């Protein structure tokens, strides 16, 4: 599919969404279906939270963060959102999560599928994503919608759910999105910077004035670990008690937030800061001038954010 054809399709799709229409693709067929206003049970793909999920997945693909089946996204669904699409559910068998998240018992999540490509989410969502329900113990899940051609949720499901549990408890339920992407500039930096929270936070804060305002608590760093298992999930969830961003060395980045816009914006900001640092290091190994610890304190005062002093060390 050519870039021009792809652009035309996306423009048509979003125009249709704004007009209250739905555009769906099934094999070679494309059709529009108008939904009657005030219909009690919306079709699943028309739900606003599903549209937001699809858009965020496509935004990440367009940034170049999701080669092949790389990366994953999950959203903790609000009770009223789950209720609005319940008529579309077809519950499957219960399966073990691979960890236990008791605080999330009974919750619903929208997640990307294992082995699925982000580039296909916008054109084949029913095959690329799924909604899952957790049992009351938080030990098992079942698919209630999606992955129509078979499959299972992302292989990083234990990491996602353990981090959802941590952020839900830490924020009184405000945080609902967990996002993992293969951000190239952040990954590159994990080969040349010490793998410490202090160094990564300070270096990325210095690259753009907005950074301490967007991620004032800093960034956590997980050393290289085998992905997809409980060990990396535990290590990441420990960092998420303190941070909204965790870098996985030589792998990518994990971000958490209240909604799709804030979480994508957080990932985008950190990766852009990393891009600036990579460019700077390609020009010379040191800086002639930068933002000082006192500058950060002044910024924190005026923008009313709290910046941990552990990142204000003298170089």
Question: What spans do the regions from the language model cover?
Answer:
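Short, Lys/Arg-enriched N-terminal segments with co-localized hydrophobic residues
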Residues: 23-41
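Alpha-helical interaction segments
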Residues: 10, 21-22, 55
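Single conserved hydrophobic/aromatic residue that forms the stacking wall/gate
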Residues: 1-12
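N-terminal non-cleavable signal-anchor helices
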Residues: 9, 17-18, 112
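Glycine-rich flexible loops
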Residues: 42-315
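Polybasic, lysine-enriched low-complexity intrinsically disordered terminal tails
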Residues: 18-21, 25, 123
